């Protein structure tokens, strides 16, 4: 029973982290003039629209996973570089804001069930934000970098984007994943500690 309830709480935490992250991308793109995500029904906080089943299981088992990427057309932005950067960072920003809200809930609400769920939401939002800031396509960290490098290099990188899964697997197996992600997680926690 404990294991089942623990898994359910994890799923809630993951669903919230993924939903706010992808909504952040979709809504920021909408504000900047691109309604591609809205047309595909992705400008929503409904987890069913964003969750990838395999990515969900991967997050529960390996603590690293993925969601269905929100479709964005940067060519609809008035300024490609600025728009692409803002949209790339919007998901991570949404994760951090959500974590802050949950910290404040735990600070002022004393109810075990709510506190437990909020704690998982915090952990997964921090983890999802840090993971997405890695400068590897198709993650948000690369989205920011790609806005400022010549198009021909972008094309070259995206040509080999399918190899990203191999890179992630290698990072996990070798333990290098923690080496790269831990500093990002530490920075995010320093921000969150300001609200504790």
Where do the PLM segments sit?
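Hydrophobic transmembrane alpha-helices and their immediate loop junctions
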Residues: 1-196
């Amino acid at each position: 029973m404990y294991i089942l309830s623990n898994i359910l709480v994890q799923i809630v935490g993951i669903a919230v982290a993924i939903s706010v992250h992808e909504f952040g991308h979709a809504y920021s793109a909408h504000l900047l003039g691109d309604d591609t995500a809205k047309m595909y029904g992705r400008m929503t906080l409904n987890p069913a629209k964003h969750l990838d089943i395999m990515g969900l299981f991967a997050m529960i088992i390996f603590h690293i996973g993925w969601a269905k990427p929100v479709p964005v057309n940067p060519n609809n932005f008035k300024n490609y570089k600025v728009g692409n950067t803002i949209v790339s960072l919007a998901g991570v920003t949404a994760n951090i804001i959500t974590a802050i809200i949950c910290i404040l809930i735990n600070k002022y609400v004393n109810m075990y069930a709510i506190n437990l769920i909020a704690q998982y939401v915090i952990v997964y939002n921090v983890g999802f934000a840090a993971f997405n800031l890695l400068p590897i396509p198709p993650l948000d960290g690369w989205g920011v970098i790609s806005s400022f490098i010549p198009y021909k290099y972008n094309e070259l990188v995206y040509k080999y984007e399918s190899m990203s899964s191999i890179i992630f697997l290698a990072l996990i197996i070798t333990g290098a994943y923690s080496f790269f992600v831990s500093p990002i997680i530490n920075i995010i926690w320093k921000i969150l500690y300001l609200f504790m």
